[in-house]
Every structure is written in structure tokens, then in C-alpha cells.
């Protein structure tokens, strides 16, 4: 089966089913990652970088090998590829989590908006005003659109089922271990660096996609001038280009785990509102359409 048809199949499954309501494989993987971290690192953060590399290899490589073997099964390998890509995607989930935030803001129900946005961001949301909630949700849509949708598609297109499994598991470990604190500074180093490497090309393709679908010149200018100021080498281009494309100002100070972080501003334009959350989702969905067209054209060109 062609890569294009496999991607279409996975996107249809995601649209119809969404994330599995019970026993998502990533939940089981998270429990495995917790046990590995407790063994190699512990609450005291005694692990070194080498322990983190070992734990990462034990968590990711056997499952990547399994994905490769499943994709080779006669007759049903194509189905395994579709299912594995579906499990790695989060397009429908992105809307299911972000749209209720926008809807609460349209109703001016700030407590509900705070409660909803707390489900998708790690910052402290208890004191956010409506603008702060809209900013947090819009940032989440732009960044998670890159991580949970476009990067998964990229690695499936490049390396099939093993590629997307390797990427999704690596991204999950970065979310669990990639903190810059006493416990994970050394142990989580490998998970963070590998995720940065795997996201480097997809993030820049996403930034180009956002720019082409929005205010292109402003998006490219924001990417060039603002992204280098952001602390993440991949989130910076994605969010700066996305904010510029939407004509909104994102970034700025935010509280994480009780500490105030002075973040630079990203984008240019108006203050974030409920409509910007919806426009960010539109940007992601339109971007998926563009990628499908490029994939279809590429398949036809090299058929």
C-alpha cells in the first residue's frame, strides 16, 4: 500500500475514533518508562547521562524493532502500519482539548476556561485572565500540532512504522524525563537531546507550513528575529512562525511549578483571544491538507 493511502487511513481512524478511551499503548509505555527511571535514576536523581542513554535504549529500541517486524507481516503489514500511525497521531484530540477552552472564553466563563486549559499546559493557570488562557491554549495548539501531528506524519513518511514509533516514544520520554531540574538534569539529557534531533527538520517544515497558510511575510520575519530568543530550538520556529501567521502576540511571562519564567514575546499583532485558538486549529488542519497534497503529488511524480 502507498504511503499516501496509509496516511489517509490513519487520519480517518483518528477522525472516527479519536484517542483510545481505554488502555492507550502510550499509557502502558509511560508505566514502563517510570519503572526504568526509578531503577536507573530514582527520586534522588542519582543517575548519570549514561544511565539515561541505557534507559532510553531499553524503552524505545525493542518496541521500534517490534514495529518493523509487524510492518513486514505478509498480508497485514499494511494494516499494522496504519494502526501504529493512528496511535501516534493526535489531530482529533488536539481539537477536543482546545475547542472547549475557546468555547468557555466565548461564554466569559473564566473558571471553566482555566480548568480546561490546565489539561493541556504545564504552567500555573489558577491566576490567568482571559488573555492569558487564550495565549496558553493557542501556544499549545501550535506546538502540539507540530509534535503530535506533523512530526508523526514526517517520520512515518520517511521511515514507515518504525520511524513513527521511534519518534512517538522518544517524544513521550522527553515529556517525562526532559526536565532541567536536579532529578532529571543528567538522566534526562539523552531523552531531551534525541527529541530535539528528531524534531529539528519537522519543526522547520511546520514553521514553513504555518507561514505559507497565514501572514507569510510577518511569519517569516518573526521566525527569523524571534525564534532564536526562545529556549527551545524547535518550539521557537514553530511558535514564532505560527504567531506571526495568526497576527497575534504569544509568549511572555508565565509561571511554571511556582516559578516565574520571563519568556520573550513571539509574533506581532493583537492580544490573544478565543478566536485565535480556533484560528490556530484551522491552521493545523489546513496544514495537514497541504501535506497530503504534497505527498500525493510526490507519489505521482515518482510513481
Swiss-Prot record:
GO terms for molecular function: ABC-type vitamin B12 transporter activity; threonine-phosphate decarboxylase activity. Keywords: Cell membrane, Cobalamin biosynthesis, Membrane, Transmembrane, Transmembrane helix. Pathway: Cofactor biosynthesis; adenosylcobalamin biosynthesis. The keyword Cell membrane applies. One of its GO terms (cellular component) is plasma membrane. It is found in: Cell membrane. This is Cobalamin biosynthesis protein CobD. It comes from Stutzerimonas stutzeri (strain A1501). The gene is cobD.
